[in-house]
Amino acid sequence: MEKGILKVELEHPDHINTCNLSHDHSWITIYVGSGVTLANSELELALGDLIVEDLDFVDSEFEMALGDVDFTGTLHGRCKFDVALGDVRMALNGSRSDYRIEAENAMGSLGIGGAYYDQKMANSWKDTSGTHHLKVENAMGDTDIQFR
């Protein structure tokens, strides 16, 4: 696909999905439906947004040159977000086992925790159990991290 918008919807609650996607030329928006678990997934986007609502992530990585990441869900294991331009918004919910988060953002805003941009992101980061590691690199823009 060389022009236009590619919309990817994953809505299979009873399955664990592996999603490996590389896209270079046109804008891509990925919507991931609720009740889905993505395991060992990797998304590399040159242009586009990643919009995730109510999803379980297991050892996943997202690399984006331009675009926004809007994430609401539960993390298990290692999760890496690497965004060169654009905003990263993460609202984490539910009880989790050990997890590792790396968020690197060269330009734009980085928000992790409760309602940062939008009141609809009312979930809060609740540190319930396990060992947690958070690495944040933000060269330009605002960084907001909330622990409750």
Task: Label every PLM stretch briefly.
Residues 1-72, 122-148:
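Right-handed parallel beta-helix
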